[in-house]
């Protein structure tokens, strides 16, 4: 394991709480006006996926920290969960990069980006939620 990962005891309660927060954020995304706020929708999608991946890590008994931790969580998912296609992993990584540009450079996303990626992002979110629920049983 990498030095950015800390081995911990699996934490089901924290994972449940993160799952609940992600589901609340997903509900909120449905209310975002994509014509006016596509960048906000993209950021929120990324936050949901990042949180769900961190819940998977928690259930596997890991935490990440430090510079590049988000990138490492995506790599962890790619290496350890083959149910995610290369295309899906690439979409998550693209979204991570885009979210950083939005947050740090004031970059604006076009509505078209969100509508083109929505199906893939929903698929990733569905897989992550299913995985977490299975691990919580």
Where do the model's predicted regions map?
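Terminal alpha-helical segments
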Residues: 1-137
């Amino acid at each position: 394991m990498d030095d950015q990962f800390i081995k911990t005891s699996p934490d089901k309660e924290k994972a449940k709480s993160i799952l609940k927060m992600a589901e609340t954020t997903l509900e909120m995304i449905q209310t975002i006006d994509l014509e006016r706020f596509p960048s906000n929708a993209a950021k929120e999608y990324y936050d949901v996926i990042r949180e769900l991946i961190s819940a998977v890590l928690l259930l596997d008994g890991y935490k990440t920290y430090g510079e590049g931790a988000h990138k490492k969580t995506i790599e962890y998912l790619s290496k350890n969960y083959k149910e995610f296609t290369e295309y899906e992993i690439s979409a998550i990584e693209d979204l991570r990069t885009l979210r950083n540009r939005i947050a740090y450079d004031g970059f604006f996303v076009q509505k078209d980006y969100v509508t083109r990626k929505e199906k893939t992002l929903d698929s990733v979110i569905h897989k992550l939620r299913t995985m977490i629920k299975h691990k919580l049983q």
